[in-house]
Amino acid sequence: MTAIQLIVGLGNPGAEYEQTRHNAGAFFVERIAAAQRVDLVPERKFFGLTGRFTHQGQDVRLLIPTTYMNRSGQAVAALAGFYRIPVESILVAHDELDLPPGVAKLKVGGGHGGHNGLRDIIAQLGNQNTFHRLRLGIGHPGDASKVSGFVLGRAPRAEQEKLDASIDFALGVLPDIFAGEWNRAMKNLHSQKA
């Protein structure tokens, strides 16, 4: 596996979206930044908050796009292009309707599954979809017409605690991810459930 050089956390900017389910990916990157004692600072040319740390001699960049979700690819393409980061070296953390709260899954490649952030990233990367994904379960409202309000809403406390636990599980497999042990990371993460 190619070493991960960029970890992207998807979300929407602004106080009104700060604690919503759609910002699950941003929560993950914020937690990495805190653990690594990295400040996430605004970078206009990358359309987001960025940070950097070194893991065993390898630079790892963090990005939370400050564009709206459906323009996330603008930020990812700008940063990846500037630092010449291959698509295969990108990990995108995002909310996942098809998984219940408390479950996180790793995946390589695939479609966007209706997720507008992933859709734009794939488009902005020249229709390349071979980046890695961390899918953070938020559950589904049960009716497709309720999805928008659901993802842009705040989770009840018990649900948020499960999401936080799934982020903890994902943080726990980062050493395997950085070591290129993708299968071990998947096995360990996929056996966890809050």
From Swiss-Prot:
Query: Keyword Hydrolase, does the record have it?
Result: yes
E.C. number: 3.1.1.29
This protein's name: Peptidyl-tRNA hydrolase
Spell out the molecular function terms from Gene Ontology.
peptidyl-tRNA hydrolase activity; tRNA binding
The EC class name is: hydrolase
This entry carries the following GO cellular component terms, namely:
cytoplasm
Specify the domain of life of the species encoding this protein: Bacteria
